[in-house]
């Protein structure tokens, strides 16, 4: 496997995402973490902020690149000459959604394959949405996101509570 693409919004990146990145980077020559630009969806962090945070937490993984994209994932894949999409799965409901997306991507380009990776069980409950919700209500996010981005989240949420 040469180049694989791990797409998502990563708003913000979680320890579950990072688990998939670390594992996926071991089975390909190059892993592109592709941050989706979705103008219809207002995120907590801008695309540039998300890209910067992911670069920070993956800096020790020499074969991981972080880029943003808009439009069809298939077009981005062609531009990057990649034929493999990496998708992390937490639950059966994730599988149902991602399976449909994989079929659509394969319909658009039969040369594209989707590889599903199960998230480590200790992160199976974790989502970016739940991280934002916990942070907004003053909960501790230390076990949910990489340490390097906790200050970014606190600053965005404007919350001063310290995790102990």
Curated annotation (Swiss-Prot):
The keyword Ubl conjugation does not apply. One of its GO terms (biological process) is coenzyme A biosynthetic process. Pathway: Cofactor biosynthesis; coenzyme A biosynthesis; CoA from (R)-pantothenate: step 4/5. SUPFAM superfamilies: Nucleotidylyl transferase. Its cofactor is Mg(2+). It catalyses: (R)-4'-phosphopantetheine + ATP + H(+) = 3'-dephospho-CoA + diphosphate. Its EC number is 2.7.7.3. ATP binds at residues 9-10, 17, 88-90, 98, 123-129. Its main location: cytoplasm. InterPro entries: Cyt_trans-like, PPAT, Rossmann-like_a/b/a_fold. GO terms for molecular function: ATP binding; pantetheine-phosphate adenylyltransferase activity. Reversibly transfers an adenylyl group from ATP to 4'-phosphopantetheine, yielding dephospho-CoA (dPCoA) and pyrophosphate. Homohexamer. This is Phosphopantetheine adenylyltransferase. It comes from Clostridium botulinum (strain 657 / Type Ba4).
């Amino acid at each position: 496997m040469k180049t694989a693409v791990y797409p998502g919004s990563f708003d913000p990146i979680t320890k579950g995402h990072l688990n998939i990145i670390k594992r996926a980077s071991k089975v390909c020559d190059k892993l592109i973490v592709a941050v989706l630009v979705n103008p219809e969806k207002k995120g907590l962090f801008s695309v540039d902020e998300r890209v910067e945070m992911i670069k920070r937490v993956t800096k020790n993984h020499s074969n991981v690149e972080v880029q943003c994209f808009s439009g069809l994932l298939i077009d981005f894949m062609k531009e990057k000459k990649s034929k493999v999409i990496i998708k992390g799965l937490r639950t059966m409901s994730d599988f149902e959604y991602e399976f449909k997306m994989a079929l659509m991507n394969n319909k658009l380009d039969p040369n594209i394959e989707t590889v599903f990776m199960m998230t480590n069980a200790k992160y199976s409950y974790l989502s970016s949405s739940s991280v934002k919700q916990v942070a907004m209500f003053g909960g501790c996010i230390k076990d949910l996101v990489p340490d390097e981005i906790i200050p970014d989240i606190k600053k965005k949420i404007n919350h001063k509570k310290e995790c102990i």
